[in-house]
Amino acid sequence: MLKFTEEHEWLKVEGGVATVGITEHAAGQLGDLVFVELPEAGATFSKGDSAATVESVKAASDVYCPLDGEIVEINQAIVDDPSLVNSDPQGAAWFFKLKLADPRSADNLLDEAAYKELVG
């Protein structure tokens, strides 16, 4: 199940774990990324908490935790090479995997059609 947030994160939910990243729209708005900071595995976050930071030549931005949960894995590849986020934001450049406190909570997020309407 693919879901989106109004803060321009995408989630691919499988078996109570969500793979989370930023959308193509967000990556395009940020420009070329030069730095990515990810949370530690085992960290817990509530929906809306700042979970990661990205820096581009334009600005620094927070990446928010889309739902309550625990970080179970991070994508070290984007820390080592932040440009991956620009080249494949909704694929290989995922940020972290989040074990959802309530897997049904993802049902309340935007579907792809609603997200496309949001970004026009």
Swiss-Prot record:
Q: How is the cofactor bound?
A: Binds 1 lipoyl cofactor covalently.
Q: In Gene Ontology terms, what is a biological process of this protein?
A: glycine decarboxylation via glycine cleavage system
> Domain of life of the organism in this record?
Bacteria
What keywords were assigned to this record? Lipoyl
What Gene3D superfamilies does the database record attribute to this sequence?
2.40.50.100
InterPro entries xref list:
2-oxoA_DH_lipoyl-BS, Biotin_lipoyl, GCV_H, GCV_H/Fam206, GCV_H_sub, Single_hybrid_motif
For this protein, the record's CDD domains field holds:
GCS_H
Family statement drawn from the similarity comment of this UniProt entry = Belongs to the GcvH family.
Record-linked PANTHER family: GLYCINE CLEAVAGE SYSTEM H PROTEIN (PTHR11715), GLYCINE CLEAVAGE SYSTEM H PROTEIN-RELATED (PTHR11715:SF3)
Q: What does this protein do?
A: The glycine cleavage system catalyzes the degradation of glycine. The H protein shuttles the methylamine group of glycine from the P protein to the T protein.
Quaternary structure, per UniProt, is:
The glycine cleavage system is composed of four proteins: P, T, L and H.
Q: Protein name, please?
A: Glycine cleavage system H protein
Q: Which organism is it from?
A: Sinorhizobium fredii (strain NBRC 101917 / NGR234)
